[in-house]
Amino acid sequence: MFGGLMPAMVTPFDERGELDFEATEALVERFIQAGVSGISPLGSTGEATHLTFDERKRFAEEVVKLVAGRVPLVVGVGSSGTREAVELARHAEGAGADAVLAVSPFYWKVGEEALFNHFATVADAVEIPVLLYNLPMLTGIELSPALISRLAGERENIVGIKDTVTVYGHVVSVLQEIKEANPDFAVLCGWEDLVFPSLLAGADGSICAFANVAPELFVDLVNSTREGELQRAAELHRRVLELVTLGARSDPPIGAIKLAMGIQGVPISPAVRGPALPADEGAREDIEAILRDAGVLNPSKAR
């Protein structure tokens, strides 16, 4: 159920910084038309930590309605506290999400037993599938293959992981130590640079941020690799590596991603929530050049 390309969906805001559901609808339709295998809102790229609790619930409800069961919807429920993560997971299940994505707690640097209790408690609170989210570069905590294996072995509804790491060896370890024993456990790469090699090693797909900008490129990369068209996939991988350089044009990359989406003709404001900063308009030419070099700039829609 969980594989292929799933964009880590941005959260559109209007010029006043409020949730923009018209832009959200346009984005959902763009993803569906691009042939994505699922959508994952309210993660890091979705600025979930910059939203109020009520906004997170409202956005989840709206995206469930807009997707309308056409592709699996994996809603982020990450929180630094277990109780809040449980409430968000229960809400997502009640709203109609197909699964939830639970990131490591990200304030206290807790040990593996505390991490096990956190994820197990979230899994016990719902009946729908739970995907773990390993994001050590932001949380300061790396989920070890041993912990992942224990969670998957002791909780039937923990069915996969979004592994956002810069070290390829971690993905390989997860594949070797967990997926070989449990082929149904979904391994989804969250780091664009590693999508192609992860797929070659046996990963099921990707949940990634830059698919917001060029979903067709990432869908093509995943499908070409799966179908054994490796020469084509290698060229698509090169284009992905070019595309992700636009992330350096804002702090964090979300602002540059939203500006790039607007350049591509997506009706979305470049607005982000603090402490994130929007991309400077002076970066527009640089971003257009990157989109062109990556072979994804649509001149008829660029604005």
Locate the predicted segments by residue:
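Catalytic cores of TIM-barrel enzymes
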Residues: 1, 182-185, 261
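Active-site beta->alpha loop and helix N-cap motifs at the rims of alpha/beta catalytic domains
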Residues: 1-7, 11-142
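C-terminal alpha-helical cap/extension of soluble enzyme domains
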Residues: 6-12, 34-36, 45, 203, ...
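Short, amphipathic alpha-helical "lid/cap" segments that border enzyme active or binding sites
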Residues: 21, 25-28, 145, 284-291
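A general structural signal for well-ordered alpha-helical segments in protein cores
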Residues: 24, 56, 60, 85, ...
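Alpha-helical structural signal in soluble globular domains
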Residues: 34, 58, 62-67, 91, ...
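Short secondary-structure transition/capping segments
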Residues: 51-54, 87, 112-115, 143-145, ...
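Catalytic alpha/beta core domains of metabolic enzymes, predominantly
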Residues: 124-125, 137-241, 246-249
